[in-house]
């Protein structure tokens, strides 16, 4: 009986140790995963039945509506499971992110690695904030309205931050600055590919933006930043 109780306690401890903590501000939802590994999963989104997945959402831009998956259809070169994959050149991307065991780095696109060199995952996107300073916002972009999402570093921790409602891009950047993030990299959002999910402290799957019944026709979903227990 004691062994059974011990096993149950260890299982509960594991669930509580590896879960997503949520903070909120007036305008933002902030998700802090506790994880042992991050990867860029390509081709097929992780399923909620995969118990070792904590959080996953769309990451890099996708180029064309194709009937089959190709790494070349992902914006710029990217690293999946420790292997560098060639993507198409994307002028909109101004930054990048890489992660390896116990370390990560946000950077300008010019500094993005040409080889994996020990990094487990990486991708390029629009750099929003670097070293606490917001990057210049283009005139066309600042008034665009959407529910926005970004991969951020706050007080030495990685987090996913999302606007609570539809806002202008300029306002979203201001909210990130007010929250005092050190770095922020844009994550692809839009109707059909804003679907994401995570596991809470009870191990329950929480869905962010329900998956549309038309999901199989959304060819713009090709890659997901994925946090693992």
Q: How would you name each of these model-derived features?
A:
Residues 17-229:
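Gly/Ser/Thr/Pro-rich low-complexity, intrinsically disordered segments
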Residues 4-15:
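Sec-dependent N-terminal signal peptides
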């Amino acid at each position: 009986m004691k062994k059974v109780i011990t096993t149950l306690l260890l299982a509960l401890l594991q669930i509580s140790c590896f879960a997503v903590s949520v903070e909120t501000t007036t305008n933002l939802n902030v998700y802090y995963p506790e994880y042992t590994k991050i990867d860029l999963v390509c081709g097929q989104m992780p399923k909620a039945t995969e118990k070792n997945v904590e959080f996953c959402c769309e990451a890099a831009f996708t180029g064309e509506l194709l009937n089959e998956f190709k790494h070349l259809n992902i914006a710029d070169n990217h690293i999946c499971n420790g292997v560098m994959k060639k993507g198409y050149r994307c002028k909109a991307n101004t930054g990048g992110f890489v992660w390896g065991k116990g370390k990560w780095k946000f950077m300008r696109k010019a500094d993005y690695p040409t080889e994996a060199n020990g990094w487990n995952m990486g991708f390029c996107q629009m750099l929003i904030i670097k070293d606490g300073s917001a990057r210049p916002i283009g005139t066309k972009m600042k008034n665009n309205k959407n529910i926005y999402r970004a991969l951020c570093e706050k007080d030495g921790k990685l987090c996913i931050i999302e606007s609570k409602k539809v806002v202008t891009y300029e306002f979203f950047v201001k909210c990130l600055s007010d929250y005092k993030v050190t770095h922020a990299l844009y994550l692809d959002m839009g109707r059909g590919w804003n679907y994401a999910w995570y596991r809470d402290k009870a191990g329950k799957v929480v869905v962010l933006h329900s998956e549309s019944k038309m999901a199989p026709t959304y060819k713009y979903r090709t890659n997901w930043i994925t946090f693992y227990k």
